[in-house]
Amino acid sequence: GYDRAEILRRLRFVSPSSSFRAGYSYSNFGLTEGAVAAAKPTGKPWEEVAEEKLYRPLGMASTSSRHSDFIKHANRAELHAKIDGAWAAKVQRYPDAQAPAGGVSSTARDLSQWMRLVLGNGAYAGKTLIKADALDQTHIPLMVRGKNPVSGGEAFYGLGWNVEFGRHGPIWGHAGAFSAGARSLVMLFPEEKLGIVVIANAFPTGVPEGLSDSFADLVFDGTLGKDKVKAWNDIYAGMFGPVIAAAKATYAAPPSPASPAAPASAYAGRYFNDFFGDAIVSGEGDALVLKVGPAAARSYSLKHFDRDLFLTFPDAEMPDRPSAVSFAVGPDGKASAVTIDFLNDNHLGTLQRVGD
């Protein structure tokens, strides 16, 4: 719920996953920080610079980095996530804070013009929009990523691009997703001046990778090989299905006998850390409620599991996946800290009590 400036300020509290350019970690706000820095000398926001320098010169009239522009289109795709085995449009996503990395709305036609720019080494319709040597720097393999799990090609990361060397030659590409229900993928073959982009309003799905790999097989081999859509769908199912199943199994039933919770007053209070700010725990009726974000905007009901451990279900796109919220209760009978598992990916999910 925080705005872009506040999120970027708080990134200082996240420990780097590697030394500079020694490893790759997917980071929408890392890329956003770079975009903000690039736009700063112009005195204009990134959204305006992107429109002036990129979208407008390429004739991308249906492309914007503003969510408000996307909403204005009557003909737009709603995000879909698989819930109880069926695709459903349940979640609204407001990505403006990370617009440079994950907030662009577009069409297949518009994105084809962008691919022409990249494959043209920064030139489009006879005009140079990006210097070729600057664009070349982004395609240099800098970090090793291993092998592509389907094609077996050697995979690396450059500056905002996956760089792969497979049986069809060098490939520049990238994929992205929102678990709320969005997928995107681009795959470029620079030696053939050929590319494909796939945008999908669904998650999780390996269809974008499967389609692009099948496209490459048809172009280079004249025939389809193995079912690439199934191969990639299986990979995505393996990435997320077991995680959900493990969480459900862990908390399928409390231990027997379960220890009762302390009185609500033991847990109620205000908790804080530098990264997430305030979290408020309060008793509402017979239940505890956790509120986080600016002005305590997001609220999560807590269901008792065992002693000082509670469960909540924070994901609208995975409503049956439980997540733990645990309290550290001291000799005085008061919780001194709370650990919120769904905020703990960077080991920053523990907040200390700072008030009642």
Place the predicted regions along the sequence by residue:
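Short, surface-exposed loop or secondary-structure junction motifs
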Residues: 1-184
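Short, well-ordered beta-strand elements
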Residues: 174, 184-201, 337-340
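Extracytoplasmic and endomembrane cell-envelope/extracellular-matrix remodeling and assembly machinery
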Residues: 149-151, 197-199, 203-217
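Short, glycine-/Ser/Thr-/acidic-enriched flexible segments
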Residues: 119, 168, 177-179, 201-204, ...
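Peripheral terminal and inter-domain segments
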Residues: 209-356
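A structural signal for short hydrophobic beta-strand segments in well-ordered beta-sheet cores
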Residues: 80, 161-163, 186-188, 280-281, ...
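Short, well-ordered loop/turn and helix-capping segments at boundaries between secondary-structure elements
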Residues: 60, 120, 124, 201-205, ...
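Short acidic-glycine loop/turn motifs at beta-strand connectors
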Residues: 83-84, 165-167, 189-192, 284-287
